[in-house]
Amino acid sequence: MSNLENLTSKIIEDANKEAEKLLSEAKKEENKIVDEKIKKANKAKEQIIERAKRESRTKAERVISNAHLKVRNNKLEAKQEMINKVFDKAVIKLQNLSKDEYLNFVKSSILSLDIEGDEEIIVSPNDKDKIDISLMLTLNNQLKAKGKKALLKISNENRNIKGGFILYKNGIEINNSFEALVDSLRDELEQEIIEALFS
């Protein structure tokens, strides 16, 4: 299994663990948000229904239908907020990796990529101090052993990413930022999280 597959498996496993861990909290939060939105919508619906009865039966049916739609939309919006929180917490968990875990992530990710070996590594300002000369020597030595150029270097450019890194060369980027990795798994994991949170 490649390092990228290991990383992907770890991220999926961590996201699943995080989803389970947050399930109780998320369920309470979801119920609170949904209940508040439903109460507001029901209150508005009752006022609208009362007014509609005075105007006409046909109009009342249309208004009731719109009120139900609004309640449904509010509930969907509340669920989407909870799903977003799960993915945001996954990124935060990755941001809280220890220095060693972060360096291992960078090393294994870069060495699993098919690169030429003369790219620049762009990191967030918060991670600049984590990348040390030892890591760069290790990376370049291992790239050289694979027959690649051993000219990998840290870019002077900073990016507004939450963690991870971006490899850059000649206008081409390989985005391994934490948010990009979590987003790339979102389609795969979203249905599982929906089932875990709302079933």
Swiss-Prot record:
Keyword Ion transport recorded: yes
Listed GO biological process terms: proton motive force-driven plasma membrane ATP synthesis
Entry superkingdom: Bacteria
InterPro entries named in the record: ATPase_E_C (IPR038495), ATPase_V1_Esu (IPR002842)
GO CC, any one term: proton-transporting two-sector ATPase complex, catalytic domain
Keywords: ATP synthesis, Hydrogen ion transport, Ion transport, Transport
Single GO molecular function: proton-transporting ATPase activity, rotational mechanism
Similarity annotation: Belongs to the V-ATPase E subunit family.
Physiological role: Produces ATP from ADP in the presence of a proton gradient across the membrane.
Protein name, entry field: V-type proton ATPase subunit E
Species, as recorded: Clostridium botulinum (strain 657 / Type Ba4)
